[in-house]
Amino acid sequence: MHESDSNLANVSILEEQLEDSKNTICIQGIKQVLSGLYKIHPTAGPVFFVRDWYFGIENFEKLLEEFETVFFEDREKGEKTSFCLTEEQSLLLLDASEAYLAERYAMGLLNRSEQSRFLLFQKLLKKKFRISYINEVLDFLECEGHLSDLRFSEAWLRQRMRSKKESRTKLYQELLLRSISSQTAKQALDTAFEDVDEEEILRDLIDSYISKGFDRDKIIKKCMYYGFPLKVINTLL
């Protein structure tokens, strides 16, 4: 079973246990496995993972301190630790675990290709993750540099410009339609057109239409559709 699927199953079990235990979770171990990521060992049921970001870093640090105090006290007594969270902490921990599931799914998509924030939001929403979790996850991924609208825009432009001959204006409009901010779109276009002559793109487009036997009016109409200004089209024709 994939790790994210396993964690999803474990969280489902945890939700059931939470209902049966008057909305509190008891844990016997907390282990940090990566920066900000922890494996939680409940006293009953399978382990699950949480990221401190989703619990609230300060809140999680406080939780760790409380757990360590109980852990060392129990160890001195020779007893097995069973640290019971408050109802609020239990619900926060459950939310944090579910948010981590959304993060795992998002990272799977990002590992395959660049994503925009809007596009990734829609994909997570389609998987039925809660909007509150989605926004927290996207904030975290942006903060960590895993998610970038600028990188997405640059990658999208490289692919688009290889397959289509369009003006900068047309490409700018297409990025805006993909919910990229005006500032980010302009920045990505500056990079994409750094060594590209827009007039050369138009000239190649016109030549391709001429070779297909299109008349002047049809060529003008098609070139304008791709965002090129009429004045420049007439000049090159």
Where are these regions (language model features)?
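An alpha-helical, amphipathic repeat domain used for nucleic-acid recognition
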Residues: 1-237
